[in-house]
Amino acid sequence: DVRGIVELAQRVVDLYYRTEGRAKGHSVNVTVSVSTFVPKPFTPFQYEPQDTFEQIEEKHQILRKSVTSKKISLKYHHSDASVLEAVFARGDRRLGEVMYRAFKKGCKFDSWDDQFHYDRWLEAFKECGLDPSFYANRRRSFDEILPWSHMDYGVTHEYLVREYNKALAAQ
């Protein structure tokens, strides 16, 4: 799957140069933007785990090594930020204390790469006795009461399970 992304981009570049009638002297640049899967509440994939930090990093490394053409540029979200996104997307009330402690450690403008300090977030989790992987990397069972199960979001649990099963069957 991962290598196939870059292979497809290379085919686009190759097709451009094989196209007759294209303007000569012009170059092509294909930008490949990839996103890490982040399970979100109220979706059929809320039950799925996110890849671990190490798995995400490995996929990014495969992508980087697979790009051999200067005609292809690669963009992706930082692994540590994706992990935190999954943690807070599927988290519960206990994360409030983690947020507060991270804030006290200076985590305020984390959407800016130069202001993001993953190590401070990990310290805050440790101080609170919480493991980010419990939230991000754990498969949830269909009968688990989720932190957002009490909310009415207009879609039934049965519908989400049905859509999840259809997606796995590629329907």
Describe the residue ranges of each PLM region.
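Short secondary-structure boundary/capping segments
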Residues: 1-6, 45-56, 88-95
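Generic detector of isolated residues embedded in canonical secondary-structure elements
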Residues: 31, 51, 158-159
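Glycine- and acidic
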Residues: 42-49, 141-146
